[in-house]
Curated annotation (Swiss-Prot):
Gene (UniProt): asm-3
Gene3D superfamilies, per the entry: 3.60.21.10, Saposin-like (1.10.225.10)
PANTHER family attached to this UniProt entry: SPHINGOMYELIN PHOSPHODIESTERASE, SPHINGOMYELIN PHOSPHODIESTERASE ASM-3-RELATED
High-level lineage: Eukaryota, Metazoa, Ecdysozoa, Nematoda, Chromadorea
Positions contributing to Zn(2+) 1 binding: 139, 141, 217, 400
Family from the record: Belongs to the acid sphingomyelinase family.
Binding sites annotated in the UniProt record for Zn(2+) 2: 217, 257, 364, 398
Amino acid composition bias (Basic and acidic residues), ranges on this chain: 578-589
Disulfide-bonded cysteines: 21-97, 24-89, 52-63, 154-159, 160-188, 530-535, 541-553
Main location (coarse class): secreted
GO molecular function: acid sphingomyelin phosphodiesterase activity; hydrolase activity, acting on glycosyl bonds; metal ion binding; sphingomyelin phosphodiesterase activity
Record-given protein name: Putative sphingomyelin phosphodiesterase asm-3
Glycosylation sites: 109, 237, 334, 463
Signal peptide residues on this chain, from the entry's feature table: 1-17
Organism: Caenorhabditis elegans
Amino acid sequence: MLLGLLVLSLAFQGTLAVTECEECKSIVDLLQFEWGEKKTEECVMEIAVFICETFHIEDNDVCNFIISDFSDEFMYVIKQILVTPHQLCGLLMKNDCGDFVDPLATIWNMTIPGNQPPFVPKQVVPPGNPTLRALHLTDLHVDMFYTVGLEADCGTPQCCRPQDMNVEIVENGDVKQPAGPWGSVGSCDTPYWLLTNMLQNIASTAGKLDYIMVSGDLVSHTVWAYTPETHSFMVKNLSDTIRSYFPKTPVYFAVGNHEGVPVDNIAPHFTPKKYHMDWLYKAMSNAWQGWIPADQEKSLEYNGCYMKKIYDGLRMISLNNVYGDRINFWLYINQTDPDGTLQWLINQLQDAENVGDKVHIVAHIPGSDGEALEGYALNYYKIINRYANTVVGQFFGHTHSEKFYMMYANPDDYKSTPTNVVYSAPSVTPYSDYFPAYRIYTIDGVHKGSTYQVIDYEEWFFNLTSNNANPTNVKWEVLYQSANMEYGLKGQIPTEYNQMIERMKTDDSLFNKYYENHNRRSIYDGRAPCNDQQCRNGYLCDARQFHQTQQLCTDLEGGIQKPEPKKNKYSARFATSNERRRGKEECKI
């Protein structure tokens, strides 16, 4: 009866051409009329899911997360931010709907110290001085249950591992794409032995490494199976594994969004204690002993951030920017500088500026690609611009693809002075249709007047096609030996990368080279060739957007088709949650 009323209501409203927002509110009204207000509140999860399906919001991460297993956390947030059921429509609908404030568009401002020194544009580092070599790994996503021969194309976003559907496929002899001996591109994560093979290759071919940066996301994409116990185990296991291959090399980790339990959800301390992430930070503090200064353990164990003076005149800052993750639902309660991480960053940069030190920042989530809350991304942008003379390296991950991002003196004007470049390194995991890869930077070394800027970098990748075909004789290959030579750069400075974007507008050879490296030459990337101007403009616009504004792309004629995002980690629970929900008669719609 209730379902019939809903269908009739939607059909009638469709003839009147009312908005989806009004349809959504009508559904809530009908449910309240049928159930009563108390039951409507009790069944808010089921209403949310029904709204998601009815209005096809499957591509909205907010909606997809709701139907996961983590209803306790979600319900706490909902009770804090929703006063009336109508506001659920305001939360879920992409358009303006009701009086609920869209957390994805909320802007707030940090107080940033004045007295900024005159900006000194970065110059190409002259040759002849000592250099440092730094390894950059990101998005390891190691799957301890990866099983050779299981279905790699299993129909869910996480394959190559034992699960009901996969086992049934194997037993019936219906395997379309067996999981390869060394990994499988697509919906599979990193086998542990692929990780160790990579580390062995680096140890034997890279020469002396001065330090290693790991920009987060250690665990697999099996988000429904996340627990504090499994995450703590993986933090220790993978930290110990890296240490075993590089016992004398310091390693500096950053917190990734997949370190959250639930995924993406790093709870600030304004939430009840049972949701706090102290267990994660303590596990990291224990696993990273010897790499983290004793005086930074308190900071690490509070909000996942720390600083270390790694050389005379150079500091490493590990910033936990999952506190800016757009899918961290705790931030929908209050996203203004959670746990004081950005104020902590300001304090660290001010201390460095006061004594003339340079700073490298290792973090996980770039401010672009719609992955960060705009308020957080814009505040971070302004902080880095304030300390543009101090920050000489930013090393991120998360996107799985190889990218760079420009920062400008005016965050909304690509014609203003380029101030910084952000490096987003390629992932180790083949998940999201890329071959595994890693990067090694050459950096201006320890000497009087060192800039500690990146001079150049090389990139290596693992061709899963050829290596799975010859599994007893695998090899890592050089994707390119020098980024400067590959892209015709005079050096790793903002003006050169800004000019590279300009050149790629018309230089087909240069753009195609960048596009191929972005995909690590993977023929499995599932994307159509980028042969038209709209596609090209999407990549060029991406490189300018370290926060979300189209004002940085107004000169790109012919339209913009943004690159496809990486695979949606939430859809893994979509079908199973639907099936589980159908059995809930007490809230059945």
